[in-house]
Amino acid sequence: LREDKKAKGATAKQLNQMEQENPLTPSEAFGSTGSNIFPIQELKAQRDIVKNRGLNDLRGQNGKLSLDPSLGVIFNVDLKKNLTRIDSMTVNEDEIGCLTVYERPIENAPKGLYKIGYDPVRQDSGTSLVSYVVYKSNMKGVSNFYNDNIVAIYIGRNETNDDNHRIGELLAMWYNTQVMYENEVPDVKTYFQRRKLLSLLALQPDGVISKAVKKSTVSRIYGCHMTTQLRDAGEKYIKDWLLQICEYDEEGKPVMRLNKIYNLRLLDELIGYDRLQATRYDVISALIMAIFQVQEEYIDKEFEDKSDKNKGKSLLKAYKSLLGG
């Protein structure tokens, strides 16, 4: 019946609804239709491609970061396969996870090219997971396969929160950028302050907040407090990003941003996302933090463009006044 509907041109939304009502597999039952605005059918197709072709291993390298006094930050690739990458929503308590890198930072990376989003845990004990997402934005003069895409993801949990924050410190140094984090967890700032590294933390995205929350008053603080309105805005930003066409393949078919996601955990989170259980979706929360930084740049650019236009009009008016026009 489902194949008949598909052959007759049923929409992705209709097919997803059928999967929820008549699931053939547990993964189909896992998907959510109520509060999930992401393109589920397209994401499922991408997940199947990643699984069948082993793209998570082909495109990404697992490893750990360390700091060398002479060489700076070093990425130590897990050649002996000692680390366990978390690929699914079901996690064993002894799995600490690892960093997966899809693209290392380019040489002499300009400040602001990369964005880091961080979803911290609230206490040392517990089963919640930490997630970091490193996003490479699009900057003039920088051309590469991963522009406007995710270049690294960490998903896991260390024994102490200091160890969790240390990952963000090294990522920020390696990619020459700052970390945007959910600031409901106060010890993130405390850690970086103690390390005299507050410059590695991103300031609150005032433009994004003002646009998402009416009558918002903002002050310059580190990180971002995730309100309902901001999560709603973040979800919409992610949806728009997923569906962006970035190129066309050899057959002339469009390639979307979601077709360049190779992390199975993120794909599963996007497919099964439920706003009512948002705290379960660690990578999405980190991605929202990264996307907010991208959007903040767009909003700042729009403001600058408008300011330039207004300045131009004022100069023209003044010039005409001098000419007696």
Q: Residue locations for each model-derived region?
A:
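Short alpha-helix plus adjacent loop in nuclease-associated cores
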Residues: 201-248
